[in-house]
Amino acid sequence: MPLEHRNMLVSALREAGLNAIDAGNFMRANLASFDMSWWRQQAPFILNNKRDFIAANIASWKALWSRGFAQAAEQRIKQSRYYQLYAEAGYDFLRPLEQKGVPLWRREEQFMVLGSDRPIPKLAEKLPWVRLSQRAFVTGTNEMNWRMFTRFVDKMYKVNERIAMGKITGKQAADWNMKRSIDSFARMIGDLTGRGELGPLKAISPGLNAGFFSLRTNLGRILTPRHLFAADPYTRKEAWKNLLAFVGGVTGVMLLGEQLGLWDVEKDPRNSDFMKIRAGGKRFDPWGGYQQYVTVISRLTTGEGVSATTGQEYPIQPFQTAGR
């Protein structure tokens, strides 16, 4: 095949592949435009950081109706005292508001379709509910994450001062490493809020995302437990505080509601409805994407699943279950 024809074929195949990816991401952006899905991303932090969550909701609501407010909120973060630290260290828990020219893997997965010059992304840009929802999503998550990050860095500077003044001594002072603590906490924010580190998987992220598989979110969910055993004691403490509040608070509300007869709660981890609220034929999952991994592990370890409709046990195929 002549080189010119070969290049034309490669270009056509590439364009067809991009159109398929764009179509999937277009559908996803529309689905994400009619709920408060950024709450799901922040779920592990909400109960232990209620003031930050309230402030983030206010910012998100204002950004929904005002592009100018959303842009100002982003600029306020970029002009704050710790943003240079954030940028130079290469942290990535903040989502870009304007996505044009931003690599696909850095964009918010729910709205990855925005920011390109191809036909489908251009159409998405013209849909007001997609644009408004993307602004609200990005502003809400960024506001909450930045508040938590700056408060932690402030705390680390205070620890550093106390060590310098001799108020903290012994092993705690000997093991002190401020950069390690901040790096570790930034990674924790990323993992727990759906910004898992992709590494060599960056190239395939857009394609998987088009198939409704959020690679960064799922990697973050899978990596979350590592922070409970982090080498840095300050990050480890924050991980335990936030995850205990998350699991304990959500479980308590669910079981209380069940006792009051408001809803039913499935307690068999082999069931896909495990620890979901069931009321009036509807299901509500407050776990932000974590529950499914408990179910998968339970099914893989027991070799059995339980039907969410009939309650009957059935044998499972390991590869099929892991794929779900």
List where the protein language model places each region.
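Amphipathic interfacial helices
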Residues: 3-324
